[in-house]
């Protein structure tokens, strides 16, 4: 009996050593495997589960189909939808940031809460631009400055840091502001202050991909300001292929808009700027809208000569 047991024990030891060797050669994290498997299964749903969402897509409230931009011509062509990422591109000096600030003011008038992560401009300068846009004059009085701040109280937040910042910090700021402050609109100005090297294509791809995931998972809209490559002649507007850095930026964003300052003489009464929508993943329209810049930094679609006061 003892000899038989010894033989069995030897065999067991040999099998155990063989098993350990196999596991060492081909490590498997079963817990991670099962967790991922369960998650994937949970994400596979029958079409009928989306009944209410589909009804809302066609017949829901206007807000469910997106928020309006400041220009009524775009009401049924392009809207700002939660869960999406928009790239606002253009040449240096063509007022991309100013346009995005004007858009943010309109979104806040519709009940949204915004956070500006401007790594190129101090908060007081950002607020100066937005105050003139909200009041409709380039030099608002102290009373109107107070009225402007009252109108954005609890709606507008600014991240007070300039210069280069690590991507992880941007992710953390967005997540905190969305979950703890209820912020739904984020402006990041600009990409080059987060991913420093123009040829760091993998870094740009990872950053933009993560922003897209955050917009979707947190149900917010992220506005990312990027730069178009410099040209000797900037009289022709840039396109998607002119975006600085990785081509994956344009591939990953939901919407791609180009802000272009129209080259013209000072006495030309025509429009001063155009916004070209070159990509809209969840909409059919692509095209452009002509705008007139007012001294208050408002952008009008009809050549309006006077500024409008919104406070």
Regions found by a protein language model. Name each.
Residues 86-88, 115-117, 157-159, 223, ...:
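Hydrophobic/aromatic beta-strand patches that form the interior of the parallel beta-sheet core
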Residues 103, 125-130, 173, 210, ...:
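Alpha-helical scaffold elements adjacent to nucleotide-binding pockets in ATP/GTP-utilizing enzyme cores
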Residues 183-224:
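Helical hairpin unit composed of two closely spaced alpha helices linked by a short loop
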Residues 35-137:
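The Walker A/P-loop phosphate-binding site
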Residues 2-21, 28-31, 52, 65, ...:
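Conserved inter-motif catalytic segment of the P-loop NTP-binding fold
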Residues 119-121, 220, 224-227:
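Conserved H-loop
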Residues 3-16, 27-33, 45-46, 171, ...:
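C-terminal regions of RecA-like/P-loop NTPase motor modules
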Residues 1-82, 150-153, 214, 288, ...:
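Core recognition of P-loop NTPase motor domains used across DNA-transaction enzymes
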């Amino acid at each position: 009996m003892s000899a038989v047991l010894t033989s069995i024990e030897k065999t067991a030891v040999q099998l155990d050593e063989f098993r350990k060797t196999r596991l060492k050669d081909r490590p498997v994290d079963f817990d991670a495997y099962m967790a991922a498997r369960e998650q994937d299964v949970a994400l596979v749903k029958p079409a009928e589960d989306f009944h209410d969402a589909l009804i809302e897509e066609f017949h829901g409230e206007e807000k469910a189909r997106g928020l309006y931009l400041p220009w009524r011509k775009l009401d049924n062509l392009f809207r700002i939808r939660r869960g999406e990422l928009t790239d606002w591109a253009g040449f240096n000096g063509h007022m991309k940031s100013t346009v995005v600030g004007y858009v943010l003011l309109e979104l806040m008038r519709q009940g949204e809460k915004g956070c500006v992560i401007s790594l190129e401009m101090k908060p007081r300068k950002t607020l100066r631009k937005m105050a003139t846009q909200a009041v409709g004059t380039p030099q608002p009085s102290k009373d109107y400055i107070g009225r402007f701040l009252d109108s954005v109280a609890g709606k507008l937040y600014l991240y007070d840091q300039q210069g280069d910042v690590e991507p992880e910090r941007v992710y953390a700021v967005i997540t905190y502001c969305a979950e703890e402050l209820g912020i739904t609109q984020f402006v990041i100005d600009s990409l080059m202050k987060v991913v420093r090297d123009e040829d760091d294509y993998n870094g740009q791809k990872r950053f933009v991909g993560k922003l897209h995931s955050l917009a979707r998972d947190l149900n917010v809209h992220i506005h990312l300001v990027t730069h178009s490559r410099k040209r000797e002649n900037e009289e022709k507007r840039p396109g998607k292929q002119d975006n600085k850095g990785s081509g994956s930026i344009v591939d990953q964003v939901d919407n791609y808009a180009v802000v272009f300052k129209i080259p013209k003489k000072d006495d030309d009464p025509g429009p001063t700027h155009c916004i070209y929508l070159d990509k809209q993943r969840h909409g059919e329209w692509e095209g452009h809208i002509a705008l007139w810049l007012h001294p208050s930094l408002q952008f009008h679609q009809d050549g309006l000569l006077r500024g409008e006061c919104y406070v």
